[in-house]
Amino acid sequence: MDDSKHILITKILKNEVTEALGCTEVGLIGYAVSLCNISDPFSIDKLELTLNNGSFKNAYAVGVPNTGKYGILPAVVGGLLGNSKNKLLIFNDITYSQELEDFIKEKLEIKVIDGPLFCNIKIKDNSGNYFESLIKDNHLNVVIPKIEKEKIDVEITTSEKGEYKNLELIDFLDYLDEIPEKIGKLVEKTVQTNKNLIKGDFLNYGTDILSIIVNKTTSACNTRMTGENMPAMSVAKSGNMGIMATLPIISYDSSTENNSEKLIKSVLLSMLVTIYSTYNSSYLSSMCGCVSKGGMGAVIGLCYYKNGKNLKKLDSSARTFTANLPGIICDGGKVGCALKLASGCFAAYSSLFVDISYENGIVGKDFKECVENISKISKAMGDLDCDIVEIMSKKM
């Protein structure tokens, strides 16, 4: 394939496939808090947290690793106890303090705004000192304080995202023929890390292939949403999207051929499609991205595993998936996400066996048009977030 396309895809993958501990948004909050570098948390007089509505939703009711607790408050406390060098793994090795939680609870003020990813921390201590941090647009884009970028950090520009959006499915397929060694190892790490999240049964329907796919995928999601101290490999800044994009294919492989080469290529293709779907819409939205974006990745990855480089069948699977689940709302990260992933698994697997025609609803002519149509609906659902957040806020 064209060298410039190959370089672009490799750079995108290095940026968008990363390790995260706990729901990405509680990690975002914890990381932002830690950047304020408060030496004595008990000196805090006021702590103001401003989140965009999507980040608020995803942090509101999800488990926070190493705390045994759920939601925004323990994420803030965990951030005060963590090391900013850990970034989205901020809750690694913290020793949680109930005393500090009780103290911070009286100092914390939460504000929710509309718009893209935004996490702003403002702290005033009892000596009148002010501290601030700001992360916006993506989970690792630290605007305040100014920090020196590490060499391993890969900055993706707006124009590069635009170039990626202009790629065709055949470009992703061609990339699979020339996988760089580092990317191959990244995919292997992703497969193993996300497999490790499978702990027991969440939805154990039986022993057929679909039931195994559903059970393993939902088990991994439940492990993450309950705040187990186990990392997930996120795709497009979402751990659950990473789970949805990988576990159905991993489960299908283990139930059928156990073919490591096909597994790596299929999972990689799924991740490329998930990122592509995200760039066509947004990182966070009113539509469940795990189903609509990670699900589309799983569909294409499964179809590739089963049928190889067959564009006709890949387009067919994309059409069938588009006729099914897009439109499910995102009401935040929580244990219930596992049920949405179960629906996504069914839709992805069934898309291998049915061909829904272009004339149906929002179904596109091919993969690319299907993604564009789903993205258009996702963007049109934007106003729903205000109502979803209003309903959730009443529970605080």
Curated annotation (Swiss-Prot):
It comes from the Archaea. Keywords: 4Fe-4S, Iron, Iron-sulfur, Lyase, Metal-binding. InterPro entries: Ser_deHydtase-like_asu, UPF0597. Its EC number is 4.4.1.28. GO terms for biological process: L-cysteine catabolic process to pyruvate. One of its GO terms (molecular function) is 4 iron, 4 sulfur cluster binding. Its cofactor is [4Fe-4S] cluster. The active site is at residue 23. Binds 1 [4Fe-4S] cluster per subunit. Signal peptide: none annotated. The keyword Transport does not apply. Transmembrane segments: none annotated. Pfam families: SDH_alpha. It catalyses: L-cysteine + H2O = hydrogen sulfide + pyruvate + NH4(+) + H(+). [4Fe-4S] cluster binds at residues 288, 330, 337. Belongs to the L-cysteine desulfidase family. PANTHER family: UPF0597 PROTEIN YHAM. Homotrimer. Catalyzes the cleavage of L-cysteine to form 2-aminoprop-2-enoate and sulfide. The former then spontaneously hydrolyzes to pyruvate and NH(3). May be responsible for the production of sulfide required for the biosynthesis of iron-sulfur centers in this archaea. This is L-cysteine desulfidase. It comes from Methanococcus maripaludis (strain C6 / ATCC BAA-1332).
